Amino acid sequence: MAFPADLVGGLPTAAYQVEGGWDADGRGPCVWDTFTHQGGERVFKNQTGDVACGSYTLWEEDLKCIKQLGLTHYRFSISWSRLLPDGTTGFINQKGVDYYNKIIDDLLTNGVTPVVTLYHFDLPQALEDQGGWLSEAIIEVFDKYAQFCFSTFGNRVRQWITINEPNVLCAMGYDLGFFAPGVSQIGTGGYQAAHNMIKAHARAWHSYDSLFREKQKGMVSLSLFCIWPQPENPNSVLDQKAAERAINFQFDFFAKPIFIDGDYPELVKSQIASMSEKQGYPSSRLSKFTEEEKKMIKGTADFFAVQYYTTRFIRHKENKEAELGILQDAEIELFSDPSWKGVGWVRVVPWGIRKLLNYIKDTYNNPVIYITENGFPQDDPPSIDDTQRWECFRQTFEELFKAIHVDKVNLQLYCAWSLLDNFEWNDGYSKRFGLFHVDFEDPAKPRVPYTSAKEYAKIIRNNGLERPQ
């Protein structure tokens, strides 16, 4: 099964999840430092990213892994507070600049394309102290940070992601409070953070477009997470509509303003307005974009970056009591099929990725698509011979093959999560997504390839999948 040239060849990491060195060389604290140091069992065994994979001092080891696999692309994120300790350009930490310069230069020397994420969940604590994503002031601060990165690294970086999974961060960090910064403003916080993130992304895109694109000739987008929503009963109109609301609230909430017309989906606006009225709010809990803002937001992405891990069945669940919450606004319930295998929240549903790719193609005018994350975890302790996990990848590649060759989806890059076992947010080190095993007990943090790494390298080398014997 042959793939288009260089389709499979990427692996990502994220700064807080791998770097460690949380207070090394002038790095300022980020919200995940604060969140994990506060304890309270919000993270598995109160684990932290203080050391993680040690990539801040062990970059050379990561580079060996990248070369061993023959990667074409390496996606990494910049620790905002390592570059700018208080989040602003008032003070620049040169040692942080040097670290990322070395990564970029080493990748290019070895023929690997850097894909750089500006912000992957790790907001500088100094900015959170001023309101974080709930404050409109963050929009200009993010734009200045983005411009600093474009001017510092953009002569060598052609592919940028502004914000990683804003939809996850808004719900988990500012609505439910399960993620850092742990703000629990149910029914309001997530929407407010999202409103500011969309505008911040758009501002950064325009800055690139007007100040850097002509010379640097790069591309800018953002990465959106999506759980594919499958109607529980495909013959039930109620469930079909519930699945439509599910993808509208989760995915189109960000994608439609940015890729289509600068505004939220009509279904989302009407659902939240109707619930807000029932709850006695004087106006909708979802802010409105001005006409000027809609023009500013529309069309601010140069490719479509999506992250898929799993699927859920969706059923209609009427919000009779007018309860607050995103799922309650959407009037949906999510659940898994008991027959789906998997670890933790990742149920293995390879066909979901093909459905999602087709949805993007049909809804967003057949864009160039990058899958910037997709993966399967093992429980700790993991098996180095992870043949069963590789089978999940193999089935996924078969679905990608069909999406490309049968459905004519314009997929141009696939990145498996992740290069290394790492700090998996609330799961700490208990879930292992890496293609390389990391021994977190050993101070040297040795990296050892799983069977999956060797198989992934074969796909890169052969530009396709060998059929199972």
Curated annotation (Swiss-Prot):
The active site is at residues 165, 373. One of its GO terms (molecular function) is glucosylceramidase activity. Its EC number is 3.2.1.21, 3.2.1.46, 3.2.1.45. Its main location: cytoplasm. Pfam families: Glyco_hydro_1 (PF00232). The N-terminus is blocked. It is an enzyme of class 3 (hydrolase). Substrate binds at residues 17, 120, 164, 309, 417, 424-425. The keyword Cytoplasm applies. GO terms for cellular component: cytosol; membrane. InterPro entries: Glyco_hydro_1 (IPR001360), Glycoside_hydrolase_SF (IPR017853). It is found in: Cytoplasm, Cytosol. It catalyses: Hydrolysis of terminal, non-reducing beta-D-glucosyl residues with release of beta-D-glucose; a beta-D-glucosyl-(1<->1')-N-acylsphing-4-enine + H2O = an N-acylsphing-4-enine + D-glucose; a beta-D-galactosyl-(1<->1')-N-acylsphing-4-enine + H2O = an N-acylsphing-4-enine + D-galactose; beta-D-glucosyl-(1<->1)-sphing-4-enine + H2O = sphing-4-enine + D-glucose. This is Cytosolic beta-glucosidase. It comes from Cavia porcellus (Guinea pig).
